[in-house]
Amino acid sequence: MECNLGTEHHSTDTWNRSKTEQAVVDAFDESLFGDVASDIGSETSLYSHAVKTAPSPPWVASPKILYQQLIRDLDFSEGPRLLSCLETWNEDLFSCFPINEDLYSDMMVLSPDPDDVISTVSTKDHVEMFNLTTRGSVRLPSPPKQPTGLPAYVQEVQDSFTVELRAREEAYTKLLVTYCKSIIRYLQGTAKRTTIGLNIQNPDQKAYTQLRQSILLRYYREVASLARLLYLHLYLTVTREFSWRLYASQSAHPDVFAALKFTWTERRQFTCAFHPVLCNHGIVLLEGKPLTASALREINYRRRELGLPLVRCGLVEENKSPLVQQPSFSVHLPRSVGFLTHHIKRKLDAYAVKHPQEPRHVRADHPYAKVVENRNYGSSIEAMILAPPSPSEILPGDPPRPPTCGFLTR
């Protein structure tokens, strides 16, 4: 996530050795959570090695064929179903993930200038395989033996996940480029075919003009569609692998995590697909208020649907109550797919931000001289995720405020 953990060290003077908190640490019964081994089997989950490599896509193919090819290459048959689910969910699962714009800022296939985009297919590319299981250089830290080590441990977990995600994303960006070029070649071939047999003076120029229009009207929309599938797979795969290993290590030390005090300063940190602490058995607060059992059950329902380990909170879970509960859905609230799309759009816009260009064509017949070369990503991103915001409202593109992590002293 794009945040650093703030640290709270609650000394004896600060907490005045609260009897309630002391009782939490002393009376925590780790047997309530059962046997860790029977719960998850081992540190390696069924998601750990689902995808080894992905080949380059077909040299030229229609976007529809490329979409199906990407599903097969990723072994992601659940992808379309999950994207449909995101249409009926309101939670923000993704905006706390790092955007890593620097990976895209020089990717010319994302240029807003159609001439730049077309120039990327002027030379033949080498066929290559993409390793989609690249690991980061930072190992998953072990839980501390004493509560005093919890703040540093949580920060190390956060850093380890960020490094792992970035390493994997670098491979995914290369795969995205090859798919973009396949779309360009398809549009190029389509434009050339439309001029065959026409009695015109310069068929090549006519074909090029039509290709430019296709880039503006269709290319960016098709790229966004592929990117939604690709980055949903990236985020889920990395988060699943990392989280199940994390859950295995944290579940073995419930007594240490019973002394944890953790605050999600923003709700989107709580609804996020990645959590640095999955065994949050101490005092947990959401936006400064005690976390409710129903809120925990609802977010765990989404996590179960996504194949992620549940967040366990020993002080919040209710006896003999289910661990999950389906949240309600409102058509008037932002949708999960909108948050994902907005997040991906920040990546796709990175080239244009670094290489700003003056618009070359404007509508002369319109009083506002509207630019006609705006990229068309398809559905209105803003309409999917945003109501008219107040000045204080947190938007998906805003960097998250740091959550706070501390420990209870004996």
Curated annotation (Swiss-Prot):
It comes from the Viruses. Its main location: virion. One of its GO terms (molecular function) is DNA binding. It holds the Pfam family Alpha_TIF. Residues 388-410 are annotated as: Disordered. Gene3D superfamilies: Alpha trans-inducing (Alpha-TIF). GO terms for biological process: DNA-templated viral transcription; regulation of DNA-templated transcription. It is found in: Virion tegument; Host nucleus. The keyword DNA-binding applies. Keywords: DNA-binding, Host nucleus, Phosphoprotein, Transcription, Transcription regulation, Virion, Virion tegument. Coiled coil: none annotated. GO terms for cellular component: host cell nucleus; viral tegument. Belongs to the herpesviridae tegument protein VP16 protein family. Transcriptional activator of immediate-early (IE) gene products (alpha genes). Acts as a key activator of lytic infection by initiating the lytic program through the assembly of the transcriptional regulatory VP16-induced complex composed of VP16 and two cellular factors, HCFC1 and POU2F 1. VP16-induced complex represents a regulatory switch: when it is on, it promotes IE-gene expression and thus lytic infection, and when it is off, it limits IE-gene transcription favoring latent infection. May play a role in the aggregation of tegument proteins around nucleocapsids during virus morphogenesis. Associates with the VP16-induced complex; binding to host HCFC1 activates VP16 for association with the octamer motif-binding host protein POU2F1, to form a multiprotein-DNA complex responsible for activating transcription of the viral immediate early genes. This is Tegument protein VP16 homolog. It comes from Varicella-zoster virus (strain Oka vaccine). The lineage of its organism: Viruses, Duplodnaviria, Heunggongvirae, Peploviricota, Herviviricetes.
